[in-house]
Curated annotation (Swiss-Prot):
<comment type="similarity">
    <text>Belongs to the EF-Ts family.</text>
</comment>
<dbReference type="InterPro" id="IPR009060">
    <property type="entry name" value="UBA-like_sf"/>
</dbReference>
<keyword id="KW-0963">Cytoplasm</keyword>
<dbReference type="GO" id="GO:0003746">
    <property type="term" value="F:translation elongation factor activity"/>
</dbReference>
<dbReference type="GO" id="GO:0005737">
    <property type="term" value="C:cytoplasm"/>
</dbReference>
<keyword id="KW-0251">Elongation factor</keyword>
<dbReference type="InterPro" id="IPR018101">
    <property type="entry name" value="Transl_elong_Ts_CS"/>
</dbReference>
<protein>
    <recommendedName>
        <fullName>Elongation factor Ts</fullName>
    </recommendedName>
</protein>
<dbReference type="InterPro" id="IPR014039">
    <property type="entry name" value="Transl_elong_EFTs/EF1B_dimer"/>
</dbReference>
<keyword id="KW-0648">Protein biosynthesis</keyword>
<feature type="region of interest" description="Involved in Mg(2+) ion dislocation from EF-Tu">
    <location>
        <begin position="81"/>
        <end position="84"/>
    </location>
</feature>
<comment type="function">
    <text>Associates with the EF-Tu.GDP complex and induces the exchange of GDP to GTP. It remains bound to the aminoacyl-tRNA.EF-Tu.GTP complex up to the GTP hydrolysis stage on the ribosome.</text>
</comment>
<dbReference type="InterPro" id="IPR001816">
    <property type="entry name" value="Transl_elong_EFTs/EF1B"/>
</dbReference>
<dbReference type="InterPro" id="IPR036402">
    <property type="entry name" value="EF-Ts_dimer_sf"/>
</dbReference>
<dbReference type="Pfam" id="PF00889">
    <property type="entry name" value="EF_TS"/>
</dbReference>
Length: 278
């Protein structure tokens, strides 16, 4: 008996771009485990698996609250349709909540939701009230507060008629508005997951190494060539996944490492929120 449904196959196709039969086989071999199925499709050579998996059907916005150039907050507020995302009250609440986070520094989402907000109501109650008025579920998904020597932000609208759905914060060790802006736009466009190779967890590196080896074998590469092939593919992973390893979008002859070295700055932290993404 199959451990998956037709809806699971459809979802996996949307996430990976792989064919229906390939998705069915991957789900069968993985016992219905989505993560293992995606990994199996990567080994089989499905294109753009990771990039497609980041796509989302969620709606909502990313709100920004920034205090000068040393502190900023990003907050994601979700709704069910883009019609509500355009709603002034929805946008106002998101902006107010981002400001509230900036002032109160809650430790996590549950702490924020249970915090006293206004008129004896908690943040959760205020969200529920607006949800009842608008007629859609509204969810406060996440937030991040960054404080440091120099913090820059970048907000992006995927549709001019909608509020921002992508936001980036970058913390540098010293002020440099031009470089900070370039880095924020770089992060928005190419979505690195880590600052440098040193920041990539060992288990992630080992998993990429294992997938690279399995993929090379699937392609029929000779066993003696595997170490070199695997290292080459790992280097490609680091180039994509780390900010400092990426080519600079304004000048692809340079890496971001070279850009920050020339500017004499250090990237201490970055946050990238896109509506619906992890």
């Amino acid at each position: 008996m199959a451990n998956y449904t037709a809806a699971d196959v459809k979802r996996l196709r949307e996430l990976t771009g792989a064919g229906m039969m390939a998705c069915k086989k991957a789900l069968e071999e993985s016992g219905g485990d989505f993560d293992k199925a995606i990994e199996a499709l990567r080994i089989k050579g499905a294109k753009d698996v990771g990039k497609r998996a980041e796509r989302t059907a969620a709606n909502g916005l990313i709100a920004l609250a920034q205090d000068g150039d040393t502190s900023a907050v990003l907050l994601e507020l979700n709704c069910e349709t883009d019609f509500v995302a355009k709603n002034d009250k929805f946008q106002e609440l998101a902006a107010e909540l981002a400001g509230f986070v900036a002032r109160t520094s809650p430790s996590d989402v549950p702490s924020l939701l249970s915090a006293d907000y206004a008129d004896g109501k908690t943040v959760s109650q205020v969200i529920e009230e607006l949800s009842a008025v608008i007629g859609e579920k509204i969810e406060l998904r996440r937030f991040a507060k960054v404080e440091g020597a120099y913090v820059a932000s970048y907000m992006h609208k995927s549709d001019p008629d909608l509020p921002p759905t992508l936001g980036v914060l970058v913390e540098l060790d010293k002020p440099n508005a031009e470089v900070a802006k370039d880095l924020a736009q770089q992060i928005a466009a190419l979505a690195p997951k880590y600052i440098s190779r040193d920041d990539v967890p060992a288990d992630v590196v080992e998993n990429e190494r294992r997938i690279a080896k399995a993929t090379a074998r699937e392609e029929g590469k000779p066993e003696q060539a595997l170490p070199k092939i695997v290292e080459g593919r790992l280097n490609g992973f680091f180039k994509d996944a780390t900010l400092l390893g990426q080519p600079f979008v304004k000048d692809n002859k340079k890496t971001i490492q070279q850009v920050v070295d020339e500017a004499g700055v250090t990237v201490r932290r970055f946050v990238r929120f896109k509506v619906g993404q992890a």
